[in-house]
Amino acid sequence: LQICPMLLNLLLLLFLAGVCTACPKECECDVSPTTNETVSAYCGKGGLDDSKLTVLLHSLPSGIRSLEISTPSWRPANSFRWNDNLNRFSSLRQLRLIGCGMPSLSRPRLPNLELLDVSNNRIDHATMANFAGFPALKVLDLSNNKLSVLPTGVFAYLKKLTSLSLANNSITEASSNILRGLENLRTLRLDRNRIPVGHLNDLISDVRSLEELGMGGCHVNPLSNLSLDRLPELRSIDLSSNNLKRVPSAELAALPRLTSLSLAFNRIDEIEPCAFCGNNLTKLDLSHNKLGLRGKILKEEAFDGTSLTHLDLGFNHIENFDSTTIGVAQRTLKSLSLSGNYLTTFDAASTRTLHALTSLHLAHNMISDFPLVFPPEYYQLKVLNLSSNQLYYLPDNLGSLLGNLKEFDLSHNRLKSLSTASAEFIDTIDQVYLAGNPWDCNCGLQQLQEHMRQRFALRRQLEYGATRCSTPEILKGQAILSAVAVNDCAVLFGARYGLSQSGELLVLLGALLIAGALLVVLLLLLYYGRERQYKGSYVTRECSRTPLTMTLPPHGITGISCSTSSSSTSDPSEVNNLSPPLPPPPPKAMSALYFGV
């Protein structure tokens, strides 16, 4: 009788544990190791509408702290409106509803929410009521929507807001006080909006504590019209896609605390000497410009007055880069990007003086082979990006050449398989990007799957969903992480050359057949050679016999003739004269009797 209550309690505990860890089939959930409760959920299978979203939200435990609903490009898109069932997640700290087709935000009530990301939707208006239910909100991302007008006081309730992104909308008009009262705001992104310069100056006047400002694609050319001197604390500014033809040195001089600058996607074709004097720049982005079209990329003393640690020269017109051209930055540079610059090799000149380099980006080039030996600076690298090249194999000695690597991007190359040595090297690296390669899942799948399982928490960052099988046909298009292994592994040498077990056996069989055929031909040649040699030596012995050793042939049988064709025409009498006389025949028996013998 006492056992029954114990069993009931056990069943109740199991039921509660199942409820706490319940995860819908559309999602992937992370469970707390201490409380065994679901703390976060990522729902990325797509195809959600209003009714499916309601069912999904009811199936999630109410105590989750992080929820993301988004979908990769290859899956069906989501399309739903804001659902008030989200209000049941009172402990929610982070909410991401990305690319879900939402037209508005309704009136949510999430008192503990700190991050809200509703980017890539169809939100075309916003009011104070939309944000009144987020008193603890610190990060708000409204980028890539259809906002055109922001009314007065729209963000008045977000007193704790530190980061706001309005990038990639259609904002053409902004009230002068929409940012007033946001004393904690440190990051503001206004990229690719057609806001008049006068309105921009009014906006930034209300947030003088701003440290990061995004103005990419805002058509603020000339930059002198923008009152940057109103932001004395500014440390990072994005001026990309503003049709700039030169570095705005004079305007940047008004920002003494500036450490990060992006001039990407402009029309700059050269960097003048002392172009960044007056700033303490450590990070500079010059990608997607016209550097290299006019010969020399950089002029001497171009980076004087800086302490650069990160330099991006990607997607210019640089075919040969010499690290000595960056002047004083050689001593401090830790990260260099030469992506998209028509490079074909790992040129030693590009890194030979960069002794502090730890991160190198060579993506989107035309590199197809690894060298036998890397330049010595490569051994100290911790990050190496080789994505979108033409690499088709990894050498077995890569571990001895890149011994300190922590992040390795090999995505979007032509890799089909990994040898045992290269797979062991991959296992020593914390983050490896392998998506977008035509993987052959006939062999070596278990080792690659085990590598991914060990880094399952980083599956979205490392794009494991896009790391898919290309062959065999039965597994084509399946994610490697969930594919069923096919045991077709090479045993001897095939893994080194990307051969399957059947391919390796065919090569071995062909080699055996060729070796057998060559052996038969060799034996036949030896046999016929020995036979001809034996016949020749026999005739020579017969001709070299002396008269004493030669026995007479029987009567009526002609002996062996060793004479040449020329001697056969000579006189027979001459031959007889040269031959010794034959011994006389023995006496007859009758004559012996006559003499009384």
Regions flagged by a language model, labelled:
Residues 7-597:
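Extracellular leucine-rich repeat
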